[in-house]
Swiss-Prot record:
The gene is bioB. Keywords: 2Fe-2S, 4Fe-4S, Biotin biosynthesis, Iron, Iron-sulfur, Metal-binding, S-adenosyl-L-methionine, Transferase. NCBIfam families: bioB. [2Fe-2S] cluster binds at C117, C148, C208, R280. Its cofactor is [4Fe-4S] cluster; [2Fe-2S] cluster. GO terms for molecular function: 2 iron, 2 sulfur cluster binding; 4 iron, 4 sulfur cluster binding; biotin synthase activity; iron ion binding. It comes from Paraburkholderia phymatum (strain DSM 17167 / CIP 108236 / LMG 21445 / STM815) (Burkholderia phymatum). Transmembrane segments: none annotated. This is Biotin synthase. Residues 58-285 form the Radical SAM core domain. [4Fe-4S] cluster binds at C73, C77, C80. It holds the Pfam family Radical_SAM. The keyword Transcription does not apply. The lineage of its organism: Bacteria, Pseudomonadati, Pseudomonadota, Betaproteobacteria, Burkholderiales. Binds 1 [4Fe-4S] cluster. The cluster is coordinated with 3 cysteines and an exchangeable S-adenosyl-L-methionine. Pathway: Cofactor biosynthesis; biotin biosynthesis; biotin from 7,8-diaminononanoate: step 2/2.
Amino acid sequence: MSQIQTAPLPVMPSQAAAAADAAASRWKVADVAALYELPFNDLLFRAQQVHREHFDANTVQLSTLLSIKTGGCEEDCAYCPQSVHHETGLKAEKLMEVEEVLAAARVAKENGATRFCMGAAWRNPKDRHLEPIKDMIRGVKSMGLETCVTLGMLEAHQAQALREAGLDYYNHNLDTSPEFYGQIISTRTYQDRLDTLEHVRDAGINVCCGGIVGLGESRRERAGLIAQLANMEPYPESVPINNLVQVEGTPLTGTEALDPFEFVRTIAVARITMPRAMVRLSAGREQMDEALQAMCFLAGANSIFYGDQLLTTSNPQAEADRKLLARLGIRAEAAQQMPAERECSHGCEGH
């Protein structure tokens, strides 16, 4: 089995630095749309310049995502096969046992991941659900892995409980722009999402927040999503950019596929508007050829989800990823002591 070259973990930006970025530029949707309109080469050149100011351009973080509770979600997100509103043939499952999750985390670490994400298909977790999840967080952190969970909407006290368990990141995506949002989901408002993100931020947990493109939105609406993310104060430390994976039985089956260059443009625009964020090349990567993935790295993506599965959709084989990164001369960040090597963006002394 080929080996991936490793590089030291980057230190995440401080809150002061991210706030300075936000103060320097409040992004209007029109300004973000203007970035999209740049000639492709000019846009990528600018994004790569910004990327090199803040990161090693030849290093990516390998993340692994595990569905710890699959299906049965009450939300009606039009893209999601885990919704009870859609007939996708997906069977709802109970929350995994703690030791099962920790075993998967050990394998992820052995395969080179430095970040382990856990996702549960809930509208919002009950307090009793958090007890085993806190054990999962503690166990994964004890392995030296960065931790992230996505559990749906949170109340303030729940976010604080996760923070006390040592959680590094909470993922809660905006999905799309405020203007297009009503076309995608009706069971949760945009403000609901923003409220959860506020609870996460107030608890001192790093924010992981991005969206999905290829939902049928316009370029202007894609610009609206990026502007919404970039204007958070501070903007998210982690920004996953997903390309719609169409699943039979969901309302978005048959949606016209997004132009591949438009996806690369979205990565580049995210990098320019959120220069210190980890921009994560997320769902939809299996449908991308190697040249397209390479362009995404050039545009500023510096993290991939690594492993054969992303929640309920497939992902490129790990060995294929190893070979691609080696051919591109890209190193995976090295597993080092966590979380000391990655600074909390809120000035806390460790999670």
